[in-house]
Amino acid sequence: MDRYGHNVRSDIKKQGYEDSNLPILCETCLGENPYVRIIREENGKECKICKNVFTHFRWKPGENSRYKQTVICMKCAKVKNVCQTCLFDLQYNLPVQVRDKFLENSIVLPENETNRNFFLEQMENDMSSTYDKMNRINMDLSKLKRRDPYFKRNMARVCSFWRKNSCNRGDECPYLHKEIHLDKSLSNQNIKNRYTGENDILAEKILLKHNEKNNDDKNMSNKICIQGISESVSQANIKECFKKFGDIKSIKVIPKDSKMFISYSNSQAAKKASDKYKDGLLLNGCNLTVHLQDNPTYNNKNQQPVINYMNNNMYQNNMSPQMMYNPMYYPYYNMNNMHPSSAPYSSMLPSEAEQRK
């Protein structure tokens, strides 16, 4: 008689309604005001994910901010370890799609409402399998982590009446009276896509930027070249001067060419060293020239392979149609396209009359 009978509710979804005193929020959504006032409403709204009624919270993060509210229930937020408002990860402050790509362990909710509610209840009873208990550290994810809150995300919207020159509120208007330039590609974001981590526009933009940065780091060399080395400059002096930019892997000295090559553990350290001493370095009375050593793999990737013309006939017979190379051009004063070491044709041999002369 506790669950049914006299304990009948008007809405069947309210039989297992959520009763919470505080929301699960990130530092950005909570705002910079330490004395924020939160309005609590029991059974105020329906969760955008599981469609269950939950305790709704509403507050104003700052003086020039707009009112924010919770859009998903606490149960769905705990399963994915996300904020109830922006649906960003609480630990890394990143979209779910970015986090799941590096952790390679995503939690997928069933599409059916009954199965989804049962799955959420089981996950709430055993929270050890959720993201909240994950202690796995990913280096790429730590680099993408947003360490400082971004309060500009809470700013008010632009006043539509101000755009029409008809706003009569003046300074009391809670909306902005200035234009802000936002990325139009982020205007069609979806709450469900953000939560499930599928087709998230913002996450795809972050991953694309991360991939471009990694490609630039791979193409950039981690070695610098120092020219003008003399006997007054020792290897210890060079190491003492360049170790502040990063971890040095190896140092190679070529006394014949008066050069020295320093290899760092990453390309960023080599770039810092070359930018610091791009105008030259004076060490022990010796003027040194420092520049970044080019990456041969990156510079030669567009060059064509060298063709061996020693066995030209055999090469043409064995060459596949896909392998097409530009022919070798010879100067106008030498029209003979044969290799110097190849045997001459019979027509090129001198005649008997020429041999008698």
Curated annotation (Swiss-Prot):
PROSITE patterns: RRM, ZF_C3H1
Subcellular location: Nucleus
GO CC annotation, single: U2-type catalytic step 2 spliceosome
Protein name, entry field: Pre-mRNA-splicing factor RBM22 homolog
Organism whose genome encodes this protein: Plasmodium falciparum (isolate 3D7)
Entries under PANTHER family matching the protein: PRE-MRNA-SPLICING FACTOR RBM22 (PTHR14089:SF6)
Keywords noted in UniProt: Merozoite, Metal-binding, mRNA processing, mRNA splicing, Nucleus, RNA-binding, Spliceosome, Zinc, Zinc-finger
Chain positions of all zinc fingers (C3H1-type): 153-180
UniProt note: domains: The C-terminal RRM domain and the zinc finger motif are necessary for RNA-binding.
SUPFAM superfamilies: CCCH zinc finger, RNA-binding domain, RBD
Keyword Chaperone included in the entry's annotation: no
